[in-house]
Structure formats: C-alpha cells, structure tokens
Amino acid sequence: CLSLLAKTVPNMIVSSADLCNSDKTDGFIKGGATVISRDNFAGGFLQAGVAELTMACVCIGITLHGGMLAACGTFFVFSDYMKPAIRMAALMELPVKFIWSHDAFRVGEDGPTHEPVEQEAQIRLMEKMKNHSGRNSMLVLRPADCNATTVCWAMAMENMTSPSALILSRQNIEPLPEGTPYEYCRKGAYISAESDENPDIIFVGNG
C-alpha cells in the first residue's frame, strides 16, 4: 500500500523510528520516495531514529502546517512512548496516520519486552471518546489479512478529521476464505465463516 501511495500521493511524508525494514514503511521508499537528509529536504521519507515521541510530534507539526499528509511507523509496543503526541493529535483532530506493526507475541527474537499486551486496549479507549466536534477521537483499524489491510489503508487515507491507527502483524498471514466481504471493514466487522441459524459458539476475531 505504501509503495502505491508513494507513487500517487506526492504531498505525503512517511517516517519510521529506525525500523523501516521491520515495520515495512520502507515500502514508501521502494515506491520511489527519497530519504530526507540535511543536504536534501526534497525527499518524502524521514528516518527519525529511535525517537518515537519526537517522530510523532514532527508528523503533527507537518500536518498542522497544512498541505501535507504525514504517517509514522514503529512497533506497536512502542506506541507507549508516543501517547502524549497521539492524545494531542486526537484533541486537535489531525489526520496523522500511525502505523504500528508487530501487534502480538510473534515478534521474533526480541522477546517479551516487545510483545504488546495492554496497548490496544489503551488505543481503543481513545477511539470511542468524542472530540470537540462530537466525532470519534481516533479511527483504529486492525485488519485480518492483506486484503483487509488494503481496505483499511483506504479508510485511513479518507479520514481527514482524526488520527488513524493501523495495527498490523509481523508475520505473514493466509488470506481469509474466498468471498469474505472485505468492504464490510467500513462497517466495523464482517462474517468470514457462516454457521447455522443457532450456533452454540460464536468466535469473534480482532486482527
């Protein structure tokens, strides 16, 4: 998705907290964006270093300036470092796109320090809080596979009244069964496997 956005959204800047190869924000570079440096400010990708809060604040500043779209990525567990900026983006109703990968315990060799547990609950609490305009403070999206991710990216890019969060996995995931109504992502949920009229158990999945 980021590779396509690099080709089609010239006023977009993407940043990563020293993790672009891991959180796949380097897709923006692969799509043609050049890296911003002290000698070249014409690029579209900002290497923020290990500075998650600063990165989020820079994206807020870019968005406040106007005329630009900003997105930033890191591991989901590090969203904790960004909370003050996320909260301010929500209060100011800024359409910053937060890309958080490695959303579960499958984080490779990094171990429990990099395994998000309580982070989604915190972000979800912000989602349904009404802002000063009476709208949700945040759009939180956790797609189930690559097809749902495409729809969720479209939703995030269309959302210009609040921050958007894309909570993504580390590992490759098999697509859901053929015929899954991915367009229902826009409604908040969809049925991927039907049952009879009176099921004994209903499994509800998130991500």
Question: Language-model features: where?
Answer:
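Long hydrophobic segments that form regular secondary structure
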Residues: 161-162, 166, 183-207
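Thiamine diphosphate
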Residues: 1-175, 181-185
